[in-house]
Design a protein with these regions (language model features):
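Short hydrophobic alpha-helices and adjacent helix-cap/hinge residues
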Residues: 1-322
Length: 322
């Protein structure tokens, strides 16, 4: 009987141990969120869209997922390396340019989800849009038609445009190619001015004051977005119509913007994160190109420039700033 009793105790202990193991909480994944722009307690529209996308898929911050936010204007490389040392399960590069480049240099193993890459193939981030082939996937902000569409909109508002100044950074090479092709088709002459920092921008302004183009555009990336207020103010002061590749430029005082819905891009990034956290490999997840676009027109700026926006264009606008 003693032997039977010991056997029963042993079996019960095994059962309790097994039950305890099954009751152990599952490992909560950690997501690194890398961004240039300063973070505030109130999420930006883009971050809010990303978090909403996660919630729709069952990922609740602080409960089913931990998010490590890292934001810096100058030491983004160090912060990307810090996320790698923390062994996060995935990194979301919020925005194009610096966050994505820093994350890619920091790791070739941890999955990286991009949100606004303008030319992921040309930048060497992925092998192709259909088969990325590495640890990076996500959304691209560009389609070949965008460059021509923006210039067509500009011509619709200002038919006399013949000379267009283009401020661009190396991160916007794909968009620059598309803009060049569109300008050639429309018979526009381009004045290309590379901007890598505030000093370059000041020099560009000095040149534009002397050369006086008919209109101005600044190609979109994380760096140029930070200068949107300066560019919009300069353009208004010198009566230059503008068209941009992000609604933030129009909201800052630019004449108009035509761009992918950025918040939608961040919501889609949450879908990529969900798939990867559930076992999918970035190498096998095709890169998405935008399908939803927004036309934003700033009527206050139009009035300041003495321009009349055609009613047909106003009716097509997704958002009009009055």
């Amino acid at each position: 009987m003693r032997v039977i009793g010991l056997a029963v105790v042993f079996i019960l202990r095994l059962a309790f141990a097994s039950a305890a193991e099954t009751q152990q909480p599952a490992k909560i994944p950690r997501l690194g969120y890398l961004v240039v722009a300063p973070l505030s307690e109130t999420p930006s529209p883009e971050r809010a869209a990303f978090l909403a996308g996660l919630r729709e898929l069952g990922w609740i911050e602080g409960k089913t997922i931990t998010i490590e936010y890292r934001s810096a204007k100058w030491n983004i490389e160090d912060l990307a390396e810090e996320l790698v040392r923390m062994e996060v399960d995935i990194i979301v590069a919020a925005g194009s340019g610096a966050p994505l480049s820093a994350a890619r240099r920091a790791t070739s193993k941890i999955p990286i989800v991009m949100t606004l890459a303008s030319d992921p193939v040309g930048a060497g981030l992925v092998k192709s849009l259909t088969r990325p082939g590495g640890n990076v996937t996500g959304g691209s902000s560009m389609t070949p038609e965008l460059g021509s569409k923006r210039l067509e909109l500009l011509k619709e508002v200002v038919p006399r445009v013949a000379h267009l100044a283009v401020l661009w950074t190396p991160a916007a090479t794909f968009e620059l190619r598309a803009t060049r092709a569109a300008a050639h088709k429309l018979g526009l002459t381009l004045k290309l001015m590379e901007v890598r920092n505030a000093d370059d921008l000041a020099r560009a302004f000095a040149v534009l004051e002397k050369q006086r183009p008919d209109a101005l555009t600044m190609l979109f990336d994380a760096l140029t977005t930070g200068y949107r207020g300066l560019v919009a103010d300069f353009a208004k002061k010198h009566k230059l119509p503008t068209v941009f590749g992000a609604r933030e430029f129009a909201e800052a005082g630019g004449l108009m913007s035509y761009a992918p819905d950025i918040a939608e891009g961040f919501r889609r990034a949450a879908i990529y994160a969900d798939k990867i956290l559930k076992g999918a490999k970035p190498a096998d997840l095709p890169v998405e190109q935008p399908t939803k676009f927004e036309l934003v027109i700033n009527l206050k700026t139009a009035k300041a420039l003495g321009l009349t926006i055609p009613q047909t264009l106003l009716l097509r606008a997704d958002h009009v700033i009055e």
